[in-house]
Amino acid sequence: MSVSIRAGGSSRDVNSVVRLHRRVYAGEYGLARSFGRDVARRLAELRRGGWPGPGEGLWLAELGDSVVGSITLNRVGGGMGRLGHLVLMPEARGSGAGRRLVEQVLEAARAAAYERLELATFSDLSAAGSLYRSVGFVNVSTERTVRWGRRMEWQLYELEL
């Protein structure tokens, strides 16, 4: 069975994104429970601001009836957008779903005439970092920090469109 990509945005879809982040990042990377709460809070803040609006979106990767991945795009201002909430369950990795999700965001950002995209991640997510660099994102800063109960290298990436 192949992974399909669809646009989302319902409350149910947003809840799926939060659940995915809790499962993957707590289970695989040992992030504290506060990470899941932060994801839920961030998505709630975006929704209160009218997200997803024109030039923004949420896309889900599905395997059968199960949501196995997600990505978001939101407008920051000044021609800049933010790619966020990229996550894939282990069963979807290696299928090309991550690349397809990122390409969906790039397509939407270009169609909305964004000038630049930004994203934040941490260095343990090496496959994601490789994917971002392969489509042209550049690491503009790295900071050693403690977040969600773990020491990590927090990375900021940008892409000129």
Feature names for model-found ranges:
Residues 10-12, 115-161:
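C-terminal "cap" of GNAT-fold acetyltransferases
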Residues 3-91, 99-104, 108, 112, ...:
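Acetyl-CoA-dependent GNAT
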